[in-house]
């Protein structure tokens, strides 16, 4: 091998360093152009405040939200009433059923990590058991921040028989006041679809050897990013 990259990529999707550089070259020019356009919009918002500094990384989110509102008349808070957490959750289940024929049924007889969490049995289109999915959406003192998908038990084989996975999707959405629905931003709804894509990957796995994802490293985010594309499809 000419170098370590050539060795490491041989069994991954990219196959060769040249393929990696080709992809990076394809996206670099349009991405840089768009970033410069967004930076100009952000600096324009800064000037509206009578400030003279140029935006740094830590200014980006605040001024980008202002720029979106000014340029597109988009206020994220006005989107939230259309994205009730329960509806978005049912939406990810609906998409999975339409695409793969699988179903999710809430279980009330399993231990939960917290009363806010929920557990669902996932069945394949033939009615066979695929696994159990936990959903734990709200922050609390014992949780780290962010969103992720994990497993309490990974799919495996024991004594020649398949052992179904127990998967968990964890988020930190704002918990609503008592009697009020939890409302998501568009980005949070997209996050739920993303993590659910990882959950589908774990539920569908059929492997004999344990691995973080049981696939090449550059495939790991593919199921989640594919699922994101369904978040705002009108159908």
Residue ranges and their predicted role:
Residues 9-13, 178, 204-212:
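Short, flexible helix-adjacent loops and helix caps
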Residues 129, 205-235:
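Acidic/histidine-rich catalytic neighborhood
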Residues 2, 197-210:
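Catalytic Zn2+-binding segment of zinc metalloproteases
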Residues 110-114, 196, 216:
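A short beta-turn/loop motif at secondary-structure boundaries
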Residues 1-175, 229-235:
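Active-site-proximal, well-structured secondary-structure segments within enzyme catalytic domains
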Residues 118, 167, 187-189, 222:
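Residue-level detector of short, conserved catalytic/binding motifs and their immediate flanks
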Residues 96, 175, 180-203, 224:
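Active-site recognition of the HExxH zinc-binding catalytic motif
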Residues 81, 85, 178-189, 212-216:
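Alpha-helix N-cap/helix-initiation motif
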């Amino acid at each position: 091998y000419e170098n370590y990259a050539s060795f490491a990529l041989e069994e991954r999707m990219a196959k060769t360093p040249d393929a990696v550089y080709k992809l990076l070259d394809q996206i670099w020019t349009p991405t840089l152009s768009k970033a410069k356009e967004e930076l100009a919009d952000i600096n324009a918002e800064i000037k509206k405040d009578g400030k003279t500094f140029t935006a740094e990384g830590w200014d980006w989110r605040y001024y980008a939200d202002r720029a979106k509102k000014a340029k597109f008349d988009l206020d994220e808070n006005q989107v939230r009433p259309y994205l009730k957490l329960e509806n978005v959750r049912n939406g990810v289940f609906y998409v999975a059923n339409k695409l793969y024929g699988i179903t999710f049924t809430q279980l009330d007889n399993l231990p939960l990590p917290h009363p806010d969490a929920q557990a669902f049995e996932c069945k394949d289109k033939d009615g066979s058991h695929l696994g159990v999915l936990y959903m734990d959406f709200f922050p609390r003192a014992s949780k780290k921040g962010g969103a992720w998908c994990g497993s309490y038990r990974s799919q495996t084989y024991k004594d020649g028989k398949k052992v179904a996975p127990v998967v968990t999707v964890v988020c930190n959405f704002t918990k609503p006041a008592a009697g009020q629905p939890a409302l998501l931003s568009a980005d949070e709804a997209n996050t739920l679809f993303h993590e659910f894509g990882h959950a589908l990957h774990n539920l569908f796995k059929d492997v004999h050897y344990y691995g973080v994802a049981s696939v090449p490293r550059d495939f790991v985010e593919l199921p989640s990013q594919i699922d994101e594309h369904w978040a705002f499809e009108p159908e």
